[in-house]
């Protein structure tokens, strides 16, 4: 049974999570990709409506359309590869008080250290399931920095229900990505 989390999330709740646990998120997710991470790392200011503290950033460039009433509709919301954000993510976790980062593929040592220090987790979303994940997005509450970065790189504020993820990097210093890589390297060395 997945652990149910509702944003905003306390540090103590995040520190109770362990690698391998399935989680479903209800509440608010903010998207952020390469342009946003670089912008923030270089001292750019968030719009006042964007509340990262005790929240979650999602490495996602959603596909969105406007319906007949002029409301945004998310048709695809799959994760993008998180490794590109490694130069920035640790700083952003600490600077903005993030409690979670959603993406795919995991992240490196700097991000893992920031998760330990600040009380944050990396949550792996299912790659290739963009339409299924979009069904968890109940509405778009806002879009920010669209003029600066364009639709895929803008910050989208999603209201989500039961958004499914797995903890693959926790606040205790464990990284499932590193553990699998190390085990694979050991096994490969046995056969080479």
Q: What are these model-derived regions, one by one?
A:
Residues 1-9:
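Short, structured beta-strand/loop micro-motifs enriched in basic residues and often containing a Trp
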Residues 4, 24, 57, 166-168:
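Structured core elements
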Residues 10, 30, 63-65, 172-174:
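Short, glycine-/Ser/Thr-/acidic-enriched flexible segments
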Residues 11, 22, 28-32:
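Short, charged beta-turn/beta-strand-edge "cap" motif at the junction between a beta-strand
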Residues 12-15, 50:
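Residue "hotspots" at secondary-structure boundaries inside conserved domains
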Residues 31-163:
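Feature captures the catalytic cores and cofactor-binding loops of soluble hydro-lyases/lyases
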Residues 89-90, 167-192:
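Active-site/ligand-binding-proximal alpha/beta "capping" segment
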């Amino acid at each position: 049974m997945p652990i149910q989390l509702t944003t905003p999330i306390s540090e103590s709740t995040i520190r109770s999570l362990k690698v391998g646990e399935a989680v479903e998120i209800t509440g608010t997710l903010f998207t952020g990709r390469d342009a946003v991470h670089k912008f923030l790392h270089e001292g750019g200011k968030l719009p006042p409506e964007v509340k990262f503290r005790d929240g979650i950033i999602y490495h996602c460039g959603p596909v969105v359309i406007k319906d007949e009433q002029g409301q945004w509709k998310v048709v695809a919301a799959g994760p993008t590869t998180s490794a590109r954000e490694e130069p920035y993510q640790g700083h952003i976790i600490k600077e903005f008080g993030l409690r979670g980062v959603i993406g795919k593929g995991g992240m490196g040592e700097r991000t893992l250290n920031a998760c330990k220090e600040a009380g944050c987790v990396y949550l792996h979303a299912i790659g290739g399931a963009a339409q299924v994940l979009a069904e968890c997005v109940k509405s778009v509450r806002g879009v920010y920095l669209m003029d600066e970065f364009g639709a895929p790189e803008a910050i989208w504020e999603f209201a989500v229900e039961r958004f499914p993820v797995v903890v693959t990097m926790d606040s205790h210093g464990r990284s499932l990505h590193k553990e699998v890589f190390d085990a694979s390297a050991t096994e490969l060395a046995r056969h080479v």
